């Protein structure tokens, strides 16, 4: 199977970036092309790492430099347009994919020609991949994905593999919505006639830390979330009760201290895990 990886790069520790790339090079079915979007100028250390891989793996890496920082959604669209294959796997530059992740996703696309997007569960870790602190569980079947998407993202963004042309056919792909590009795209897709599913396995290890909670409780983040769900309500994807729920929880999140947010996030929004299964 010929397939792509689409990565967006701005700020990252070089070591994390290397771990992420290596996890994709170890896939049981190798990618045909890895597209790295440089979203604005990078540090010399990161440039060095990217150049090393581009020289080492001739023809595998395609580097897309953007003159200025466009933000996640628009940068990913640029990368998507440059991908030469129809099937594209998303990956964050500090996360680790398990070796069979893409093979299992490719099998689903072979089984079901109408499938447009396939995600997986994630395990979140602190410091080392062995230190799993939580998992984010999402629904498996299309109809449950549509329902779940009324309030929350029904896919784990860093795990998805999708059909490039289906994404771009859905109102031009990613939109420029601050930190909520994933839920915005996915809910538009599954409500717009594109078929989705999630695999019932954690196939990506996601790096987490206290900064993630600080970002989630920023007013810009809360406002953006409310705006996206308001748009879903106007479109008829979400109900009024969903919008009210999101407004109350996002304002609560903004007001709540970080320690409380961390407890709620792990107990309610995610399932807590202490060891890797």
Locations of the language-model features?
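Glycine-rich, basic loop-to-helix element that forms the pyrophosphate-binding segment
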Residues: 66-83, 104
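Acidic donor-binding loop at a coil-to-helix junction in glycosyltransferase catalytic cores
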Residues: 178-185
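Catalytic core of nucleotide-sugar-dependent glycosyltransferases
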Residues: 202, 206, 214-238
């Amino acid at each position: 199977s010929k397939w792509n990886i689409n990565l967006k790069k701005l700020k990252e520790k070089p070591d994390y970036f290397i771990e992420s790339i290596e996890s994709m090079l170890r896939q049981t079915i190798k990618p045909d092309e890895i597209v790295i979007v440089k979203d604005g100028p990078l540090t010399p250390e990161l440039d060095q790492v990217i150049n090393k891989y581009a020289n080492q793996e001739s023809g595998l890496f395609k580097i897309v430099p953007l003159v200025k920082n466009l933000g996640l959604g628009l940068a990913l669209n640029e990368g998507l347009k440059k991908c030469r294959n129809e099937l594209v796997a998303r990956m964050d530059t500090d996360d680790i994919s398990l070796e069979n992740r893409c093979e299992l996703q490719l099998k689903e696309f072979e089984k079901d020609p109408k499938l447009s997007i396939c995600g997986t569960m994630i395990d979140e870790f602190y410091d080392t991949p062995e230190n799993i602190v939580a998992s984010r569980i999402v629904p498996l079947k299309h109809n449950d994905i549509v329902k779940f998407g009324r309030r929350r993202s029904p896919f784990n963004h860093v795990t998805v593999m999708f059909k490039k042309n289906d994404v771009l056919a859905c109102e031009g792909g990613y939109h420029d919505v601050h930190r909520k590009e994933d839920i915005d795209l996915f809910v538009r897709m599954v409500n717009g006639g594109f078929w989705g599913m999630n695999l019932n396995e954690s196939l990506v290890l996601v790096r987490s830390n206290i900064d993630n909670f600080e970002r989630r409780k920023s007013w810009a983040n809360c406002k953006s979330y409310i705006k996206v769900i308001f748009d879903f309500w106007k479109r008829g994807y979400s109900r009024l009760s969903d919008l009210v729920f999101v407004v109350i929880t996002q304002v609560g999140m903004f007001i709540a201290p970080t320690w409380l947010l961390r407890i709620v996030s792990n107990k309610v929004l995610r399932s807590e895990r202490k060891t890797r299964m």
